[in-house]
Every structure is written in C-alpha cells, then in structure tokens.
Amino acid sequence: MQLSPQEKDKLLIFTAALLAERRKNRGIKLNYPEAIAYISAAILEGAREGRSVAELMSYGTTLLTREEVMEGIPEMITEVQIEATFPDGTKLVTVHNPIH
C-alpha cells in the first residue's frame, strides 16, 4: 500500500486519537499529544462529513474539558491547527482555546 506523507500523518493522528478516546472513556486524563490528537481527529472527521470551517472551529471547543486532561494542559494548548479535506478542497482549521 502506497501512502503519501499527508495520508501517513492522518493515520498517525487517527491512531493516537483512538488511544486517547479509549483512555478518556476509562477516566484517564489525557496528556498533551493525546489531547491534540483527539481534537485533530474530530476536526478531520467533521470535515469529511461536510461540516463548515466555522462549525468545526466552534465544535473543537466542546470536545474536552479541564477535568479530562492533565493539569496544565489547557494552558499549553492555546490553539489547534489542522489541515482538513473538505468537499471543496483542503482548508486550515484553527480552534482557539479548545479546552475549557
């Protein structure tokens, strides 16, 4: 199977997000890379579903709470940027202050 670097990146994000989701469901607080992957994967999937950039920017702030991540993580993650594939092309989605 031949994958482009972008496809490999998306698979890595998905794998990390799957691990993060499992840990979150077990009540384990997420660390920095897990939180980034969890939010990024949700944005990528939302784009594939046809949601707009504005919708995803808002949606990204509802995915994790302070109680679901390790101490200090909300302050470390001031924004998440991910290039997502939409029906009309690739766009950069930025989620500001995603963890409340």
UniProtKB/Swiss-Prot annotation:
Pfam families: Urease_gamma. Heterotrimer of UreA (gamma), UreB (beta) and UreC (alpha) subunits. Three heterotrimers associate to form the active enzyme. InterPro entries: Urease_gamma (IPR012010), Urease_gamma/gamma-beta_su (IPR002026), Urease_gamma_sf (IPR036463), Urease_subunit (IPR050069). GO terms for molecular function: nickel cation binding; urease activity. One of its GO terms (biological process) is urea catabolic process. Keywords: Cytoplasm, Hydrolase. The gene is ureA. Its main location: cytoplasm. Belongs to the urease gamma subunit family. Pathway: Nitrogen metabolism; urea degradation; CO(2) and NH(3) from urea (urease route): step 1/1. It catalyses: urea + 2 H2O + H(+) = hydrogencarbonate + 2 NH4(+). This is Urease subunit gamma. Gene3D superfamilies: Urease, gamma-like subunit. The lineage of its organism: Bacteria, Bacillati, Cyanobacteriota, Cyanophyceae, Oscillatoriophycideae. It is found in: Cytoplasm. One of its GO terms (cellular component) is cytoplasm. It comes from the Bacteria. Its EC number is 3.5.1.5.
